[in-house]
Curated annotation (Swiss-Prot):
Name of the protein in question: Phosphoenolpyruvate carboxylase
Active site, per annotation: H172, K601
Top-level taxonomic group: Eukaryota
Gene3D superfamilies, per database record: Phosphoenolpyruvate/pyruvate domain
GO cellular component: apoplast; chloroplast; cytosol
Amino acid sequence: MANRNLEKLASIDAQLRLLVPGKVSEDDKLIEYDALLLDKFLDILQDLHGEDLKEAVQECYELSAEYEGKHDPKKLEELGSVLTSLDPGDSIVIAKAFSHMLNLANLAEEVQIAYRRRIKLKRGDFADEANATTESDIEETFKKLVLKLNKSPEEVFDALKNQTVDLVLTAHPTQSVRRSLLQKHGRIRNCLAQLYAKDITPDDKQELDEALHREIQAAFRTDEIRRTPPTPQDEMRAGMSYFHETIWKGVPKFLRRVDTALKNIGINERVPYNAPLIQFSSWMGGDRDGKHPRVTPEVTRDVCLLARMMASNMYFSQIEDLMFEMSMWRCNSELRVRAEELYRTARRDVKHYIEFWKQVPPTEPYRVILGDVRDKLYNTRERSRHLLAHGISDIPEEAVYTNVEQFLEPLELCYRSLCDCGDRVIADGSLLDFLRQVSTFGLSLVKLDIRQESDRHTDVLDAITQHLEIGSYREWSEEKRQEWLLAELSGKRPLFGSDLPKTEEVKDVLDTFNVLAELPSDCFGAYIISMATSPSDVLAVELLQRECHVKHPLRVVPLFEKLADLEAAPAAMARLFSIDWYRNRIDGKQEVMIGYSDSGKDAGRFSAAWQLYKAQEEIIKVAKEFGVKLVIFHGRGGTVGRGGGPTHLAILSQPPDTIHGSLRVTVQGEVIEQSFGEEHLCFRTLQRFCAATLEHGMNPPISPRPEWRELMDQMAVVATEEYRSIVFKEPRFVEYFRLATPELEYGRMNIGSRPSKRKPSGGIESLRAIPWIFAWTQTRFHLPVWLGFGAAFKHAIKKDSKNLQMLQEMYKTWPFFRVTIDLVEMVFAKGDPGIAALNDKLLVSEDLWPFGESLRANYEETKDYLLKIAGHRDLLEGDPYLKQRIRLRDSYITTLNVCQAYTLKRIRDPNYHVTLRPHISKEYAAEPSKPADELIHLNPTSEYAPGLEDTLILTMKGIAAGMQNTG
């Protein structure tokens, strides 16, 4: 297959180069990278499983490729016959092989993107901001602002110093690849990048070839399937591993690049080390969101202590290197006095240190100071470890750092002293990097947000009011709730004592507040209230924080998710800001979170995107009226259906005046790996967030014209009606959805700790947004993304033919509208209604077939309208790179789609019989064995026929890798 596949890839490449002459450059190496990895893998497959199995993989690939050429459904049935004739062990190996090939295609693509970026930088090209595959780096953005937009370098520097990007890592269950495999993928990526480096010697090449072979084989031999669901502590450790591996060193490296870029526009100052350019927060271990049974108060406590221990350990691991560097004897008098005092009071020898274990003499004053810092870091780490393991520690608080100011003070003293003595160049080396790390990560590494549903707070307050015999808080009107809450907040008496009767749920909420009171305040960020609808939801949390003695109360952030909540959000915030007590409490600063996932599930992507846009404008307007600086926290997922898309485009298409140098955004699931999995990815992520935030503030996008707004409002009404009439009102829809997609089987992937439903029973409403999008992504039908668009466009153009011209103008000149259309176009390029039709034929009862056909007709009509508005003849004609990447993976994904459909048929229909051919895989083993039995033994408790469950899960993971989205 290798040679034939190489020819096929080369022919696709040639077609793509002809498609848009001059657009896919001659130095593009994606095909070469892809073919190299595929060649290696197929050799490994033959070595491990024999020629016959490799031939079966080849046959499947070629049938898929033939289908991709003509979209003849008979080819899918032929492919289905081949796949269903395999015995259970062979079926697992083939599903695993195609899943593995898609992961390799992703790695080839990542290396190619990095390669193309380096070439562009060498040429000094400006990025094409309208293109979904490119983005400006920080230097390009500075130059663009100064040279093209006539901003002064000082204005740029001033805006930069005062901006903040807070990236919030969440444990949303969308990372379908195990950490064991992610690490191997990282090593494959590195080998591939080094193999194509210039000046590589023959010996280096040979060793890299061997390493590449080893890592590809190791990845293939690793079980892709998580056999048990992760706990919140597992998720937190997985999230924290990115800090250890890339983010920790990536931040100072990125800030140095910012310094260099500033120099290149004439600013001879560095970004101050305490400028809050980048911050990190987390939801891992803090995200309850209603009934998440595994996130308990104890888990929250453990996660905070673990993060604290990790932070002090990472500082501790660097401090001796810094002591080696700080060998200077000249210092200012302030530092000398401190060093002599420490020398007199310090212990003599410290034998548990590797370096500088003997007492440092006062002639090396910086080392004396840093030695004391080292002692305190050691104690800080050990105290966190004791508290984590035993709940108590004999290390007193005086011997540790309890807040970041204590930690920064001696480091700042060293920095000032070096500058005073003419050694600024030394101060601006590793010491500056260390100071920047301390300012960014503090003592807690990340700040943990707590998220809880508003109903859970209502339960607690209802228990309190019933116990006090003053009525039922739950049944009170909003006015009465506010009146009582404000009276209690203004008073000083405690509301309840230890005699308060507590259900398990009430105890859980109160114990969480007790953890907030117990741990250092710098462990925590925001307290987010999901399903927030009224001011009392916010005041309730303020009161509970006070009652549980939280010394430094967390800022309270309402989260508006559904369409009606987004529409009501500006009025709710105005009511909240009009309360004197609350305005005094917030000191002119407020954060509001908007949810992209649930709003999309509630009303469809078109209406959700437009309502999110309008809600931001309105909330900002309300905040300005009350003199409040508002930060909008964007709860975006990775997929387009959950608000995802290229970062720079997403930021630059936000309404003007809504970011103003403060951006807070979630980084979820698989997006964490795509953003921080490698050093260069981390660097690029920090650049794109900072650059786009700066550009949005200094060069805001245009506001839509009144006639555009009017048209959008009309279309949104039609889009919502169309979406809801099908998803919520059509009686056949729920049955069709459950039959046509693997939604019911989603939970078997074990990719997250939380349940896939908010309520155990219930329909689409109770299903979380992630499995909702995941299920449609698997069938390549993507219904939640496009449903409603076609009806909206059809209505607008039928009403007045001039509206087509207006929509085309909106696409050309309004970033928000262009990004919305481009992202849906990208999803159509990844879609294939032929796969959905196959699923219908195999899995859906015949009486529902006409319903499926009507949805597919809607899909095609929507696609046609989309192309008309974008002025494109074909999907992605303006983005050949993306088209190239999608085309390369289509044949792999199609095989997995067909395998999934037939596997689901075998699982769900006991009367569906297949004829199996003899086992074709050979396997090396110490003793003769049946490899099928070995593979099936990995899942001995499956309720299905042998091998079917693992085959199904492998197809899900492979399709997720191929679509580059799970949920």
